[in-house]
């Protein structure tokens, strides 16, 4: 990562209330380097520059620290190159993370990065999200997705995997508020509701971001 990208990462994390240690920064630099290297061979991300990686992958992923705590079990559905799972795991080291993607090459990359960074309690799994219900019903405190699907589809797939007091978090960009509003009827039919809608902007770029936080409705 170049110096500009490093400063963007530090600034963005600080604005989120995260003060990255030198070890954590080193992990992010290694991750960025491997992402750039592997992306020349396989389709991990359309984002190529160090600055965009710092903001649109790393800082964007870290916005989840507004909701996710440093304990419990988190599932990331459709994680691609490891976002938001790996950035979150770097800063929330006590969190147990399962990162799932249907593309095997992307999962292999995530496992490679996890080994390099010595990430404990991190599991990258090659499986479709629909196939998890039988083996992982009711096991997760948080289930997250970033640009994986629309909100009702995400909720329908993942609610069976959520603990009774757990949270689903859909990461959305511009238009997230309208999408959340439009999903309320479908969520009600599924036995879920929006517990919180967090709105903020990424540093420097000012791009809009929303965290749509959902919960099960008590029987």
Curated annotation (Swiss-Prot):
UniProt-listed CDD domains: AdoMet_MTases (cd02440)
Pfam families: GidB
Catalyzed chemical reaction(s): guanosine(527) in 16S rRNA + S-adenosyl-L-methionine = N(7)-methylguanosine(527) in 16S rRNA + S-adenosyl-L-homocysteine
EC nos: 2.1.1.170
Matching InterPro entries: rRNA_ssu_MeTfrase_G, SAM-dependent_MTases_sf
Superkingdom: Bacteria
GO terms for cellular component: cytosol
Record carries keyword Cell wall biogenesis/degradation: no
PANTHER family for this protein: S-ADENOSYL-L-METHIONINE-DEPENDENT METHYLTRANSFERASES SUPERFAMILY PROTEIN
Role noted for this protein: Specifically methylates the N7 position of guanine in position 527 of 16S rRNA.
UniProt similarity note: Belongs to the methyltransferase superfamily. RNA methyltransferase RsmG family.
Annotated protein name in UniProt: Ribosomal RNA small subunit methyltransferase G
């Amino acid at each position: 990562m170049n110096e500009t990208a490093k400063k963007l990462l530090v600034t963005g994390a600080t604005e989120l209330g995260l003060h990255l240690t030198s070890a954590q920064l080193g992990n992010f630099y290694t991750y960025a380097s491997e992402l750039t290297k592997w992306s020349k061979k396989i389709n991990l991300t359309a984002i190529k520059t160090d600055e965009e990686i710092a903001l649109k992958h790393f800082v964007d992923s870290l916005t989840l620290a507004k909701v996710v705590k440093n304990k419990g079990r988190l599932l990331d559905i459709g994680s691609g190159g490891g976002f938001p799972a790996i950035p979150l795991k770097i800063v929330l080291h006590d969190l147990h993370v399962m990162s799932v993607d249907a593309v095997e090459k992307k999962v292999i990359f995530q496992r490679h990065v996890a080994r390099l960074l010595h990430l404990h309690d991190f599991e990258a799994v090659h499986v479709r999200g629909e196939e998890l219900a039988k083996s992982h019903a009711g096991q997760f405190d948080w289930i997250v997705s970033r640009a994986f699907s629309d909100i009702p589809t995400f909720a329908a797939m993942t609610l069976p995997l959520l603990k009774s007091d757990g949270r689903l978090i859909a990461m959305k960009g511009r238009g997230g508020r309208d999408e959340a509003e439009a999903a309320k009827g479908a969520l009600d039919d599924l036995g879920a509701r929006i517990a919180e809608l967090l709105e903020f902007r990424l540093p420097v770029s000012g791009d809009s971001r929303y965290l749509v936080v959902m919960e099960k409705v008590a029987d």
